[in-house]
Amino acid sequence: MTHRYVLPWILNGVPLGDHVLEIGAGYGAATGELLKRVSQVTSLEYDSRLLQRLRATHSHSRIVSLRGDATSMPFADGSFSSVVAILVLHHLKSRELQDRAIAEIYRVLRPGGCFLAMEISDGWLNRAMHYKSTFLPVNPASAFARLNCAGFGKVSVDFRRGSFRLRARKTGEEPAHGRARAASSATA
């Protein structure tokens, strides 16, 4: 279902470039579709069981699958032309961890690169579905400001059937939190 209904809504009309980082790849529901659109996919998955299934399902020379954490990624600055995170941020245990993941996404993107995400809205059904796991929904009203604070420009938030997509582009400017740190260091 993910590749048939959700991915076109998230990805269509956005140039992904040549190398996509897929965060929270899970068992690979979106990985194959991403590979149809770009020449290289790097999939990052925190759960070792899901990573094992991902590797078994998608063993291709153009896919690299790694175990890792979105809040501290093992990649050089500017490594990816785009980053895709489908149903990832609400699994992080605090707003601070969500913001750290957003900052990491900004860091690993090339200038001009796109960040594309989908999240689910807060509500009793989504809470019930996550009763055994972390569910800290991203507030779509604050997403715009949080992405801008990380340095992203051209941010859009669009709603559809109990979910929303985020689209943002990495600017060439230093993130707002970096400017604030630099200013406080200069006055110290």
Q: Over which residues does each language-model region extend?
A:
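A conserved beta-strand element that flanks and buttresses the S-adenosyl-L-methionine
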Residues: 84-85
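C-terminal alpha-helical "lid/dimerization" subdomain adjacent to the S-adenosyl-L-methionine
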Residues: 114-167
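Conserved alpha-helix/loop element of class I SAM-dependent methyltransferases that forms part
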Residues: 1-18
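A short His-aromatic
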Residues: 90-94
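Short glycine-centered segments of the SAM/dcSAM-binding site in methyltransferase folds
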Residues: 19, 112-114
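A short glycine-rich, Lys/Arg-flanked "PGG" loop and its adjoining helix->strand segment in the class I
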Residues: 99-111
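C-terminal lobe and adjacent flexible extensions of AdoMet/dcAdoMet transferase-like proteins
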Residues: 167-188
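Class I SAM-dependent methyltransferase SAM/SAH-binding core
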Residues: 21, 26-72
